[in-house]
Every structure is written in C-alpha cells, then in structure tokens.
Amino acid sequence: MAGKKAPYGEFAGRKLKLKRKKFRWSDIRYKRRVLRLKEKSDPLEGAPQAKGIVLEKIAVEAKQPNSAMRKAVRVQLIKNGKVVTAFTPGDGAINHIDEHDEVIIEGIGGPKGGSMGDIPGIRYKVVKVNRVSLKELVKGRKEKPRR
C-alpha cells in the first residue's frame, strides 16, 4: 500500500504550507524577486532615478509601422560608470542638451521595466538637464544655466 502524499487532518495546515513553498521557485516572478535579480542587473541599481554625464547625441530608428528618428543621448552614470541610452521626450528637446551636460534619468515606463512604444532598446528617459526640468526647457519657461 502506497503512502499518502499530502498530510490530512485538522492540524495539517503548517505542513501543507511548507510543502507548497517549494513550488514557488517555478514562478519566474517569485524567483527574480527573492533572488533580487533586477537590482543586480539594473544599471540604476534599483533606484528610481540616476545622475549621469552626456557622452553623445544619437538618433534611433522607430520600429515598424512607424518611420521616424527618435532622438536620444548616451549617458554615463556617475555612481557606477555604466553607459545607458536615454530618450529625450518633447519636440526639440535634443537641442537643449549638449555633450558633457549633467542629466537625471529615470525609467521610461514600459512593460516589465522595458522599452516603450516604438523606441527599441531604450529603457530610460531624460528628466532634468543641469538641474533644470527638461519639460520646462522645451516649453520655454526656463533657461539652461550658463557655465
């Protein structure tokens, strides 16, 4: 006669709970969360924003069916020296950013921390340039401080 797999009974709750725990490891979201894999691989190291220096301005081609050159910048992060690409949101926003400017970047808001819409491989966007909001610069409300 084969033994029972699951414990039965009025006080078997704790044992059942312990038995179910091992199946959590097959869930990829649980595994990534518990082992902190996002923080380990993330250039921002789990932080919401990061400061960096602009290395160069680039134009990235939009994915099909759209046809456009999305303006972006290559940024070297100050805290760890990693280089990432950040999108510059707004009409003519790239004109307000020069090489060697200090920028603050944050996630672009795509699904699962990935890229957004038709911009391939870009997971970050520029928020501030030399401590001034990029949005304000584009609207013309504020000017970039002269060095």
Swiss-Prot record:
Belongs to the universal ribosomal protein uS12 family. The keyword RNA-binding applies. Keywords: Ribonucleoprotein, Ribosomal protein, RNA-binding, rRNA-binding. The keyword rRNA-binding applies. GO terms for molecular function: rRNA binding; structural constituent of ribosome. Part of the 30S ribosomal subunit. SUPFAM superfamilies: Nucleic acid-binding proteins. One of its GO terms (cellular component) is small ribosomal subunit. InterPro entries: NA-bd_OB-fold, Ribosomal_uS12, Ribosomal_uS12_arc, Ribosomal_uS12_bac, Ribosomal_uS12_euk/arc. It comes from the Archaea. GO terms for biological process: translation. The gene is rps12. PANTHER family: 30S RIBOSOMAL PROTEIN S12 FAMILY MEMBER. With S4 and S5 plays an important role in translational accuracy. Located at the interface of the 30S and 50S subunits. This is Small ribosomal subunit protein uS12. It holds the Pfam family Ribosom_S12_S23.
